[in-house]
Amino acid sequence: MADIKEDIDKGADVIETITGERPLFLRAPYGNVNFIQLNQLDCFFIHWSSSTYDWFREEEEYIYKRIMKEAKDGAIILMHDTREVTVKAVLRAIPELQEQGYEFVRVDDLLSRNGDKLKMGVPYRSCKYDRGAVAF
Protein backbone atom coordinates (compact mmCIF):
# COMPACT_ATOMS: atom_id res chain seq x y z
CA MET A 1 0.00 0.00 0.00
CA ALA A 2 2.88 2.37 0.78
CA ASP A 3 4.22 1.93 -2.77
CA ILE A 4 0.85 2.82 -4.29
CA LYS A 5 0.52 5.94 -2.13
CA GLU A 6 4.10 6.95 -2.98
CA ASP A 7 3.44 6.55 -6.73
CA ILE A 8 0.24 8.60 -6.50
CA ASP A 9 2.00 11.31 -4.49
CA LYS A 10 4.87 11.50 -7.00
CA GLY A 11 2.45 11.92 -9.89
CA ALA A 12 0.43 14.49 -7.94
CA ASP A 13 3.63 16.42 -7.16
CA VAL A 14 4.46 16.67 -10.87
CA ILE A 15 0.95 17.82 -11.75
CA GLU A 16 1.00 20.38 -8.94
CA THR A 17 4.39 21.70 -10.09
CA ILE A 18 3.10 22.20 -13.63
CA THR A 19 -0.43 23.45 -12.92
CA GLY A 20 -0.18 24.94 -9.45
CA GLU A 21 -3.04 22.71 -8.27
CA ARG A 22 -2.84 19.35 -6.55
CA PRO A 23 -5.15 16.78 -8.13
CA LEU A 24 -7.85 15.34 -5.90
CA PHE A 25 -9.28 12.86 -8.38
CA LEU A 26 -7.92 9.49 -9.46
CA ARG A 27 -8.93 6.85 -11.96
CA ALA A 28 -7.40 3.58 -10.90
CA PRO A 29 -5.77 1.65 -13.75
CA TYR A 30 -8.39 -0.59 -15.33
CA GLY A 31 -10.76 0.54 -12.56
CA ASN A 32 -9.13 -1.92 -10.17
CA VAL A 33 -9.28 -0.68 -6.61
CA ASN A 34 -10.05 -2.39 -3.32
CA PHE A 35 -11.73 -1.15 -0.15
CA ILE A 36 -8.42 -0.81 1.71
CA GLN A 37 -7.10 1.50 -1.02
CA LEU A 38 -10.37 3.42 -1.12
CA ASN A 39 -10.16 4.18 2.57
CA GLN A 40 -6.42 4.87 2.88
CA LEU A 41 -5.77 7.18 -0.04
CA ASP A 42 -6.66 10.86 0.19
CA CYS A 43 -8.38 11.22 -3.15
CA PHE A 44 -11.70 10.82 -4.88
CA PHE A 45 -11.90 7.76 -7.11
CA ILE A 46 -13.61 8.60 -10.38
CA HIS A 47 -14.39 5.67 -12.60
CA TRP A 48 -16.79 5.49 -15.52
CA SER A 49 -20.26 4.40 -16.42
CA SER A 50 -19.29 3.46 -19.98
CA SER A 51 -16.33 3.29 -22.32
CA THR A 52 -15.63 4.07 -25.94
CA TYR A 53 -13.12 1.18 -26.01
CA ASP A 54 -10.74 3.51 -27.81
CA TRP A 55 -7.85 1.53 -26.35
CA PHE A 56 -9.12 -1.50 -28.26
CA ARG A 57 -10.39 -0.07 -31.54
CA GLU A 58 -8.59 2.99 -32.80
CA GLU A 59 -11.19 3.92 -35.40
CA GLU A 60 -12.81 7.35 -35.37
CA GLU A 61 -16.21 6.15 -36.61
CA TYR A 62 -16.39 3.36 -34.02
CA ILE A 63 -15.44 5.72 -31.17
CA TYR A 64 -17.90 8.37 -32.38
CA LYS A 65 -20.74 5.83 -32.45
CA ARG A 66 -19.83 4.64 -28.93
CA ILE A 67 -19.91 8.23 -27.64
CA MET A 68 -23.31 8.86 -29.19
CA LYS A 69 -24.68 5.57 -27.85
CA GLU A 70 -23.30 5.96 -24.33
CA ALA A 71 -24.09 9.64 -23.75
CA LYS A 72 -26.82 9.59 -21.13
CA ASP A 73 -27.80 11.93 -18.32
CA GLY A 74 -25.07 11.87 -15.69
CA ALA A 75 -22.73 9.61 -17.69
CA ILE A 76 -18.98 9.49 -17.20
CA ILE A 77 -17.50 8.17 -20.44
CA LEU A 78 -13.99 6.73 -20.43
CA MET A 79 -11.72 7.89 -23.26
CA HIS A 80 -8.01 8.44 -23.76
CA ASP A 81 -6.98 11.89 -25.00
CA THR A 82 -3.63 10.58 -26.16
CA ARG A 83 -5.26 9.03 -29.21
CA GLU A 84 -5.80 11.34 -32.17
CA VAL A 85 -8.80 9.36 -33.42
CA THR A 86 -10.49 9.79 -30.03
CA VAL A 87 -9.98 13.55 -30.11
CA LYS A 88 -11.46 13.69 -33.63
CA ALA A 89 -14.46 11.61 -32.57
CA VAL A 90 -15.08 13.84 -29.53
CA LEU A 91 -14.86 17.03 -31.60
CA ARG A 92 -17.41 15.53 -33.96
CA ALA A 93 -19.77 14.36 -31.19
CA ILE A 94 -19.81 17.51 -29.03
CA PRO A 95 -21.91 19.74 -31.36
CA GLU A 96 -24.43 16.95 -31.95
CA LEU A 97 -24.79 16.24 -28.24
CA GLN A 98 -25.13 19.95 -27.50
CA GLU A 99 -27.95 20.11 -30.06
CA GLN A 100 -29.62 17.30 -28.09
CA GLY A 101 -29.41 19.49 -24.98
CA TYR A 102 -26.36 18.02 -23.28
CA GLU A 103 -23.99 20.17 -21.29
CA PHE A 104 -20.34 19.19 -20.84
CA VAL A 105 -19.03 19.63 -17.32
CA ARG A 106 -16.04 18.71 -15.20
CA VAL A 107 -16.54 15.42 -13.44
CA ASP A 108 -16.46 17.02 -9.97
CA ASP A 109 -19.13 19.50 -11.08
CA LEU A 110 -21.25 16.66 -12.42
CA LEU A 111 -21.04 14.69 -9.19
CA SER A 112 -21.76 17.62 -6.88
CA ARG A 113 -24.19 19.74 -8.89
CA ASN A 114 -27.24 18.32 -7.13
CA GLY A 115 -25.94 19.50 -3.78
CA ASP A 116 -24.23 16.20 -2.98
CA LYS A 117 -20.93 16.45 -1.14
CA LEU A 118 -18.26 14.19 -2.61
CA LYS A 119 -16.84 11.62 -0.21
CA MET A 120 -13.38 10.14 -0.25
CA GLY A 121 -13.36 6.35 -0.32
CA VAL A 122 -16.32 6.09 -2.68
CA PRO A 123 -15.75 5.00 -6.31
CA TYR A 124 -17.96 7.27 -8.43
CA ARG A 125 -19.15 5.97 -11.80
CA SER A 126 -21.96 8.33 -12.76
CA CYS A 127 -24.41 10.88 -11.40
CA LYS A 128 -27.82 9.25 -11.35
CA TYR A 129 -29.68 12.45 -10.48
CA ASP A 130 -28.49 14.81 -13.17
CA ARG A 131 -30.34 15.67 -16.35
CA GLY A 132 -28.64 16.79 -19.51
CA ALA A 133 -25.02 16.68 -18.33
CA VAL A 134 -22.21 14.35 -19.31
CA ALA A 135 -18.50 14.23 -18.41
CA PHE A 136 -15.69 12.88 -20.58
Regions found by a protein language model. Name each.
Residues 1-122:
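Catalytic domains of cell-wall/extracellular-matrix polysaccharide-remodeling enzymes
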Residues 117-136:
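C-terminal accessory extensions appended to soluble enzyme cores
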